[in-house]
Amino acid sequence: MVRLWWLLIFVMLTTKGWAAEFQLSSPTIKSQGKIGHEHVFAGFGCSGGNVSPALQWQGAPKDTKSFALTMYDPDAPTGSGWWHWVIFNLPPTLNSLPANAGKLDGGIAPAGSIQSVTDFGQPGYGGPCPPAGDKPHRYIFTLYALKLDQVPLRSDASGAMVGFYLRQNMIAKASFTAFYGR
């Protein structure tokens, strides 16, 4: 009987280690690395390619009904940060986004997904473009696994409004941070 209890305790302690951890990554932007010129905004004094990075994820909770992704700069000199990309209603079967999925007229983002307004004043991806001379800013990419099939918002919703819905309906999230300065 004592052996059975020890076996049960061992299984309970080690099972979590076998479960896949929810992770988000990019083949072109390393966690804690520098964001390349191809992903930098084209405007506001920046001359990058404004191509959203390819992203991939694994280990999402089994009860995920949809995903949402945000890119946020907490260091922007606004007092409230800067939303660079907000895309939601991504299907639960998805495990990656190709490069340039943030381009609105490219037809690359998954059907049914919605890209809402960024702090650049338009929907779709808007790459890094911190003020010249600032220390490198942090850009946080976060993928949310949601308990909703659809976030009930449109493309004119602000990043803050979408963020509220995401946090209220989140099952899990995975993030990585990268840097850019000029």
Task: Please place each PLM-identified region on the residue numbering.
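N-terminus-centered regions that define maturation/targeting leaders and the start
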Residues: 17-182
